[in-house]
Amino acid sequence: MTKNLLEQLREMTVVVADTGDIQAIEKFTPRDATTNPSLITAAAKMPEYQEIVDQTLLQAKKDAGAGASKGQIVSLAFDRLAVSFGLKILQIIPGRVSTEVDARLSYDTEATITKARELIAQYKAAGIGPERVLIKIASTWEGIKAAEILEKEGIHCNLTLLFGLHQAIACAEAGITLISPFVGRILDWYKKETGRDSYPSAEDPGVLSVTTIYNYYKKFGYKTEVMGASFRNIGEITELAGSDLLTISPGLLGELQATIGELPRKLDPAKAATLDIDKISIDKATFDKMHAADRMAYDKLDEGIKGFTKALEELETLLAERLARLEVVASH
């Protein structure tokens, strides 16, 4: 009997759950899980996770001390909430969780390093070592340089919002653990730009982008892992079967599980090794030049950072409202 697509995918690719929803992770038993500000904000709104939110706020209030302002308490709780979700997730997966650095620090190398160290220290205080955490950082030049320093300290990074080959090469040269090239957001840009409603999966610009990056890495023997992310349909996923990892939303994991059919391997290191590819070296000037020339990558990186920033601000508002409610309850 033919297996479902998810079972077959797992035979060649590490399947990762792209969600902060703990129940969804329990259902699909992925090896790893990834979160981002939008996913944490969505999970924080779900009734079943209010207890995590409340506990985090109350602990932050206690730790911030008597004279702390509401803003200081919320800021502390906000940092801890992503780790609280991460800790819950690590109880049910065997592998690693990705926790994102504040997107507002994306163009500040020093602040990114400081924040990453703080997140790792929080995990460590809860008994989780750095080998089980990936720190997610946007693939700006400043973010990549921060990650290069963090990797040397034994803090592993997942470089996200990656849309162009120049970003991927800079990450590989910096010795980053893993990258998350986005598929669906690239497709979105091309659909809007061309006015096309759809692309066949094999011609999907996001699929082609990740395929190019994967082949480049394997051709030149880079250790940085490729984890395709941001999928719009299962066709994009099946075209990337064989990628080191793929991080997939619960909805699409369910669709893969419900689909029976053959799944051929599309990405293969042995095939990549035979390709005729030119090697490029990336310094800041080259990165800036290639980034400016790649309008899609330029637009989507900027938009992605703004989107995550908006989600962070929404989460801060949500936490402030929740804190006010908890204080009212406590005063009665």
Swiss-Prot record:
The keyword Flavoprotein does not apply. It is found in: Cytoplasm. Its EC number is 2.2.1.2. One of its GO terms (molecular function) is transaldolase activity. GO terms for biological process: carbohydrate metabolic process; pentose-phosphate shunt. The active site is at 136 (schiff-base intermediate with substrate). Keywords: Cytoplasm, Pentose shunt, Schiff base, Transferase. It catalyses: D-sedoheptulose 7-phosphate + D-glyceraldehyde 3-phosphate = D-erythrose 4-phosphate + beta-D-fructose 6-phosphate. It is an enzyme of class 2 (transferase). GO terms for cellular component: cytoplasm. The keyword Transferase applies. InterPro entries: Aldolase_TIM, TAL/FSA, Transaldolase_1, Transaldolase_AS. Coiled coil: none annotated. SUPFAM superfamilies: Aldolase. Pathway: Carbohydrate degradation; pentose phosphate pathway; D-glyceraldehyde 3-phosphate and beta-D-fructose 6-phosphate from D-ribose 5-phosphate and D-xylulose 5-phosphate (non-oxidative stage): step 2/3. Belongs to the transaldolase family. Type 1 subfamily. PANTHER family: TRANSALDOLASE. NCBIfam families: PRK12309.1, talAB. HAMAP family: Transaldolase_1 (MF_00492). Transaldolase is important for the balance of metabolites in the pentose-phosphate pathway. This is Transaldolase. It comes from Nostoc sp. (strain PCC 7120 / SAG 25.82 / UTEX 2576).
